[in-house]
Amino acid sequence: MKLTQPLADVYCKEQKTALEAQRLAQEISFAPMVFQVSRLMVKFGILEYLSNNHKGVTQTEIVEYTKLSNYAVQVLLEASLSIGTVITSDDKFFISKAGWFLLNDPMAKAN
């Protein structure tokens, strides 16, 4: 493949450290789980509920709102914390910036 020099500088040699490459490989391998959890957080209205409650909500409040089991909500919240779409403080959960964009960005919604 013939590449212009700026593209060759990027695509013809390794750009990542071993640690960065390992992190990327893990992100790729977890992508289906990240997608499914995020999709369910939108489908069940949890991200929207968090977005509308700026003072945060407890896990119990989310269970009451969604009518999902406590375990289901716990799994979704814990995964969302790792994904980065939710943050927590003082036993309350809040939507993160990434969660807000997932909920509101037209391109994120389309994909």
Regions of interest found by a model, annotated:
Residues 1-111:
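N-terminal accessory segments
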